[in-house]
Amino acid sequence: MIKDIISSVNPYLEKKMLITLSMGFVSGVPLLLTITLLQAWLTDEGVSKSTIGLFALVGLPYSLKFLWAPIFDHITLSKLGRRRSWLIVTQILLIITIVSLGMANPSMNAMNVAILATLVAFSSASQDIVIDAYRRESLTDEEQTIGASSYVLGYRIGALAAGAGGLILADYLSYQMVYVFMSSVMFYGLFITFIAEEPKHNNQPSSFVAAVYNPFIEFFNRHVSLSIPVLILLFILLYKI
């Protein structure tokens, strides 16, 4: 029995699965910084409930990320490879935007906070795009299930750390310091990106049509009823708002 347990756990302890787990973790942190922790901060600063309600729109980049996702398929920034180079860019952007958000003053300028929170969400959504592509290309078809489980576990841990962990820290530190502390998590993300290997099967689409239009049409052609793909797309668009 013990051997069976060990054999079932071993795949999760492989290097690429631990990297997938870590990428899930750094992907889960920014989301709660713009939702749970930000709402608590706004409430403590006396921002009106109607204004706080409008901050739900900050999550729109997560739903609209398909608009700029093709950029990450067509442009390679450095010799590190297409996926890792974009991961570094998005993680540096997250560090800058999270720190900037923490330095803002909600009671003095809520609009400035909203803009910075949207930039955090944009950087986070962009990181999610690249991580999803990296995971799909670096794992074999047989490893996708374990990889997805590892990613979701890491994502939940990251979200818990940013949400519950951030609120606990806010009892002892200022919100500014909490955001600065949370931004340091992205340095762990940079470390993971540097030790990760660029996917070997990394074929770049020949054109925008091949990358976006053809897969989109093929997705609709799979289903007899138009309502099924429409419902799937609506779920993808709305589930993080």
Please describe what each predicted stretch is.
Residues 2-62, 228-235, 239-241:
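Helix-loop boundary and gating motifs at the non-cytosolic
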Residues 61-66, 143-170:
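Glycine-rich segments within core transmembrane alpha-helices of 12-TM secondary carriers
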Residues 70-75, 102-103, 160-180:
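Transmembrane alpha-helix termini and helix-breaking/packing motifs in multi-pass membrane transporters
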Residues 74-91:
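Cytoplasmic membrane-interface "Motif A"-like loop-to-helix N-cap segments
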Residues 87-108:
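C-terminal ends and interior cores of transmembrane alpha-helices
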Residues 89-96, 176-195:
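Symmetry-related core transmembrane helices of the 12-TM Major Facilitator Superfamily/SLC fold
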Residues 119-154:
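Cytoplasmic helix-loop-helix junction between adjacent transmembrane helices
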Residues 195-217:
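Flexible cytoplasmic inter-helical loops of multi-pass small-molecule transporters
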